[in-house]
Regions:
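Short, hydrophobic transmembrane alpha-helix segments
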Residues: 2-5, 25-34, 50-62, 83, ...
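Hydrophobic alpha-helical segments within and immediately flanking transmembrane helices
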Residues: 16-26, 34-54, 73, 77, ...
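Transmembrane alpha-helices
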Residues: 14-23, 176, 180-204, 216, ...
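Membrane-helix/interface signature in polytopic inner-membrane proteins
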Residues: 151-190, 207, 215, 496-534, ...
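Mid-bilayer segments of alpha-helical transmembrane spans in multi-pass integral membrane proteins
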Residues: 71-72, 76, 96-114, 134, ...
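Interhelical loop and adjacent transmembrane-helix boundary motif
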Residues: 2-6, 48, 205, 225-227, ...
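Short, non-helical or kinked segments that cap or interrupt transmembrane helices
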Residues: 15, 24-46, 87-92, 161-164, ...
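Transmembrane alpha-helices and adjacent helix-loop boundaries
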Residues: 16, 90-94, 98-114, 130, ...
């Protein structure tokens, strides 16, 4: 009987997954948009239903109004944000990361960060059928999903709208030539997908306690369900949701509730690796969405090439030509390091110096992410977990064996590099969107290990140690100035190391892989080996940053290195500029000092960060430094390009606002 009860519980979990997965499948199948904010959109339905219940509205109206409100919000996000990124999937994905932060923090501001439960006579009613308990909300959710699946099946299989949507999913260009109104169909899919999430969220609020951060734990599995079931296949989504929910529910009952999420993640990982096209119908290209560095740099790189040609052809003297060829960016790097070196002198207060230290530590992690993305085109979302590996290695060696800091540092780098190597071997052979999903899943598995291996990590309580890094000869790092300079020296060493990698033959091979993988492979480049190698280097650098973060905070917990830290690292690099050397440092400076300068609370600061990330992707995808670099190139043409024909080819300053000419987005708007 207990087994039957667990299967019933699995049914409720599968229904929750299905409400997210159906929306993902419909939207992703048509737009190739990796929308990781779908879990937060479901939570909006939960919060709105909770508010309507508190306002005293009938329960049916609470569910209906929450569904309609979320559908409208989803369509607004489509028109204002996602519609601008149809030809650049990576930018759409990054926008969804920003929306995760925005919706989470806005929910905290509006509803608070406590766990919320909706209690009504309906929610507490339970049916007992031969010893098996069925709650009234569970029955409502199951019946609703059966009706919803019937409607969706009829809509997509038997109507003109459904056939048009499937045609667009298979080949958008051909569908456009046939006269199918792409914009209307995309609006339709966003409305339907968001409404399903809102409906599921409203009923979810009647079944489970939730808070502002509950969405992330469901969206990974739901995205895997959409892919496993086959994009666009309603039947596949149903089967895949059961396939993942049942092992998780049984593991929770018979093995360990704390390890239960790991089973769902492992099953999803294995199926994505060995059955990437789905169990049933698949769009066939769902995992082949091309995440390209060019989404953030195309026109900027083209303008740099024109600038180099103009300098070579210009009539300026040889000394001045060499200075111009040296470039603004390298001057900027030297100036940045001089300013960072003088920070303890410039920043007189201890609080400002502490912020500067935090900035430098984040910049170290940002440089590692920058290396993989800028050099190899590998968009990694594992920064937080790999920093955690380094931080826990240092904390464990210090706590149990009192190992010297200068031995902890290489051990942590090696451990994080080894974990990154394993992740790379597992995930990097997959295509872009699958790689993002797999790395997030494997990162969550690492965080679960941190939480559950209490004998090593002390679980969610974590490890605390106030000891400073070990002295180096006469230098003691107990003071704020000395610790800052330690972090600064590690940033300088990391930057020099990355510069050497970029200038090496290995770095040039990575560029060839980034620009054209198939061509690089045809020229004899071992693409898989080189990508795994650069991912391993990224892990080692992240491990070093994790050690420094542990010594900066003087404690370590699994929550310290969870998904929000990864999103912060992505924000730092993209905010500063993903294709310029100064990008990680400038992005880290803005990220660290902005709350202090504007006197923002932590919640408001995170909300501002999310808005900044979305605004940067929409308004200036090359980042702050990339924007100024573009303006510098344009100004150079106007002031110095005197050779005939050079001025005529000068780039328009306004072109740097958006390096991607999103023609497809314009067609469907």
């Amino acid at each position: 009987m207990q087994l039957v009860q667990q299967l019933v519980d699995a049914l409720s979990l599968a229904a929750v997954y299905l409400t997210i997965a159906l929306g993902i499948s419909i939207i992703y199948g048509l737009t190739r948009l990796v929308n990781f904010a779908q879990g937060q959109i479901l939570l909006l339905g939960s919060f709105l239903a909770y508010s309507f219940v508190r306002a005293g509205l009938p329960l049916v109206w609470c569910i209906v109004l929450a569904t309609l409100a979320v559908a409208i919000i989803g369509e607004i996000l489509d028109l204002l944000l996602f519609r601008r990124t149809l030809s650049s999937p990576l930018r759409g994905f990054v926008i969804s990361l920003g929306l995760i932060i925005i919706i989470e923090q806005a929910s905290v501001l509006i509803w608070g960060q406590n766990v919320i439960s909706v209690s009504t006579p309906f929610t507490t009613h339970v049916f007992n059928l031969h010893g098996v308990l069925f709650s009234a909300p569970l029955l409502l959710l199951v019946v609703t999903m059966i009706v919803l699946l019937t409607i969706l099946f009829f809509l997509f299989e038997r109507t003109k709208v459904g056939r048009g949507t499937q045609a667009l999913s298979e080949n958008r260009a051909t569908a456009q030539l046939m006269g199918i109104p792409v914009g209307r169909y995309i609006s339709f899919t966003f409305l339907v997908g968001s409404a399903i999430a809102g409906l599921g969220g409203a009923i979810f609020a009647l079944m489970y306690p939730f808070d502002a951060f509950s969405g992330t734990q469901y969206v990974l599995i739901a995205f895997a369900i959409a892919i496993i079931g086959g994009l666009g296949s309603i039947t596949g989504c149903v089967v895949a949701s059961l396939l993942l929910a049942i092992p998780q529910s049984l593991a929770s009952a018979y093995i360990s509730i704390s390890w239960a999420p790991a089973f769902g993640l492992i099953v999803a990982t294995l199926i994505i690796l060995f059955r990437p096209n789905g169990i049933f119908k698949s769009a066939g290209t769902g995992g082949a969405s091309h995440f390209a560095l060019g989404d953030f740099s195309d026109r900027l790189h083209a303008s740099e090439i024109r600038l180099a040609a103009a300098i070579k052809a210009s009539r300026v003297n040889s000394v001045r030509r060499r200075l111009q060829q040296w470039g603004m960016e390298r001057y900027g790097i030297w100036c940045a390091f001089v300013l960072l070196g003088l920070a303890p002198v410039i920043l007189r207060s201890d609080s400002s110096l502490s912020i500067a230290t935090y900035m430098v530590i984040l910049a170290i992690a940002g440089v590692g992410f920058w290396l993989t993305f800028r050099q190899a085109g590998v968009f990694s979302v594992a920064s937080g977990a790999l920093m955690g590996v380094g931080g826990y290695m240092a904390a464990y060696l210090l706590d149990r064996f009192n190992v010297n800091f200068w031995l902890q540092l290489p051990a942590a780098a090696a451990a994080a590099g080894a974990v990154a190597l394993v992740i790379g071997v597992i995930a990097i052979r997959t295509s872009a969107s699958y790689f993002v999903i797999l790395t997030l899943m494997l990162s969550e598995l690492i965080i679960l290990l941190f939480t559950n291996f209490t004998s090593v990590t002390n679980g969610s309580i974590g490890l605390v140690d106030s000891a400073p890094p070990s002295s180096l000869g006469p230098i003691n790092f107990g003071g704020a100035d000395a610790f800052y300079y330690l972090a600064f020296c590690l940033l300088a060493a990391t930057t020099l190391f990355v510069f050497g990698v970029c200038r090496s033959r290995f770095g040039r091979r990575l560029i060839s892989i980034r620009e054209n993988t198939e061509l690089a492979r045809s020229l004899g480049v071992n693409v898989l080996r080189d990508k795994i190698a650069v991912f391993t280097l990224f892990g080692a650098i992240s491990g070093v940053a994790g050690v420094m973060l542990f010594y900066y905070l003087h404690y370590i917990t699994p929550a310290t290195y969870d998904v929000p830290l990864t999103l912060d690292i992505v924000l730092i690099v993209l905010l500063g500029g993903a294709t310029v050397w100064l990008g990680p440092m400038v992005g880290a400076a803005i990220f660290a000092f902005l709350p202090s300068l504007l006197s923002l609370s932590p919640v408001v600061a995170q909300l501002v960060y999310g808005c900044c990330l979305v605004a940067v992707i929409i308004l200036m995808p090359t980042g702050v430094v990339g924007k100024f670099k573009g303006l510098y190139i344009s100004l150079w043409f106007r002031l110095h390009a005197t050779t005939k024909g050079v001025v005529d080819s000068a780039p328009n300053m306004s072109s740097f606002a958006d390096p991607i000419e999103n023609t497809e987005s314009n067609q469907v708007s």
